[in-house]
Amino acid sequence: MKTLRHLSVLLLLLAVGGVCMACYSSKDLKAHGKRVTVTRDVGYFSKVDASGSVDIEFVQGKEQAMRIVGSKQLVDNIVVEKKGETLYVSHKSNSVISFFDDDVTLYIYSPDLTEVNLRGSCTFDVKGALDTDNLKVSVMGSGEADFDSIVCDAINFEVRGSGDIGAKRIDTKNAVANVFGSGDLDFDFLKADNVQFTVSGSGDLDAMLSQVKTMQLNVVGSGDMDIKAQNCGVANCTSAGSGSITLSGTMRDVVKNVTGSGDIDTSNLRAVLK
């Protein structure tokens, strides 16, 4: 019996040791040591493509520049490449970033920004005003993109997964925004001629719309859409599934199309302008 007990203990120790060796062989990177700042010359870019768990802050400026701030080990693990007008940001292969320590922040500057693609858990924060022709933003995974102020001709925002896109103010002509999955889209104030919003899945879209002439609002699945309107035109609303569309404020007319157990709520429309 004593021999059997000793054998069991030995097997347990070997198993634990194997797990520990596996953990240490996975290149788990943790922040330690003093923080460093590294400046890189990246040349002109107007598009950003990021993957992994990097935090990025963007400021529109006259010239392009980049600096990376974090612990030396994590900063050295960041890979930055430019192909054409696209700036690619990622981690070195087979490395795992620890979320329990300081992370890495990239501060980038460029006179133009027309496209942002995020994959993984990256964050992209645009500080101050952004003035551009067209802006396309895609978040795949659990990442997040935030904007202070956007002035442009057209926007196209898309969330796939559980990520988020938010904007405090947008002035544009045409706005397209889609949520596929459980993510969120939030527009504190959006002024446009035409908007087309779709929620497919269990996600949410909240927007304050001003002086929008035509609105195409679609919910497919169990998601929710909350629209507050200021002096808007016609809203064509479709709910297919168990989701809901809630409208409040002032608009000229509403066209409803409900398929399933969903709902299009117009009880909080204070007035319908004719």
Language model: regions and residue ranges:
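Short, surface-exposed interaction patches in beta-rich subdomains
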Residues: A167-K274
